[in-house]
């Protein structure tokens, strides 16, 4: 069985890693869709798709990496066509993992089976919160996997975020 998990991963954090592990506990293969892949260097989408891909790959244990495939999902500004757009990019999947209510509605309209991902401390483990902590020079390192932290340090995320 194959599953789909879509997120912007701005940045990839421990909540996302938990969602990946949860997804892989339910399916053999997990397709990870990097949403808004065509957007970067913006306040809401500061990291490029390649940087986000590197954060994901460097954060996932080598023992499970072969069960994951990553796809770029650029935005289409048409909600009615979005699921069809996703389906044109990723291979067939049996389950969709999401906690986003709007994403759930869109996929369920297309007869997809949606599984909610158990969340812990959603406000703490949110990209918006983590980006703000980086800008404010507060501790954010404990909220992201070590692999993602290395990528963020390498690309000087702090400087980029402060300049946006």
Residue ranges and their predicted role:
Residues 1-164:
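Nucleotidyltransferase catalytic core that binds NTPs
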């Amino acid at each position: 069985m194959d599953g789909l998990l879509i997120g912007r991963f701005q940045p990839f954090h421990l909540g996302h890693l938990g969602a990946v592990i949860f997804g892989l506990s339910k399916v053999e293969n997990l397709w990870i869709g990097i949403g808004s892949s065509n957007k970067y260097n913006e306040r809401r989408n500061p990291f490029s798709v390649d940087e986000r891909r590197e954060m994901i790959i460097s954060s996932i244990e080598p023992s499970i990496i072969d069960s994951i495939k990553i796809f770029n999902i650029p935005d289409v500004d048409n909600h009615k066509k979005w699921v069809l757009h996703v389906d044109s990019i990723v291979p067939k999947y049996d389950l969709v993992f999401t906690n986003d209510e709007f994403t759930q509605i869109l996929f369920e309209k297309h007869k997809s089976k949606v599984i909610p991902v158990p969340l812990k401390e959603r406000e703490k483990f949110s990209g918006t919160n983590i980006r703000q902590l980086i800008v404010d020079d507060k501790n954010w390192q404990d909220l992201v996997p070590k692999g993602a932290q290395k990528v963020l340090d390498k690309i000087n995320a702090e400087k980029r975020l402060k300049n946006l």
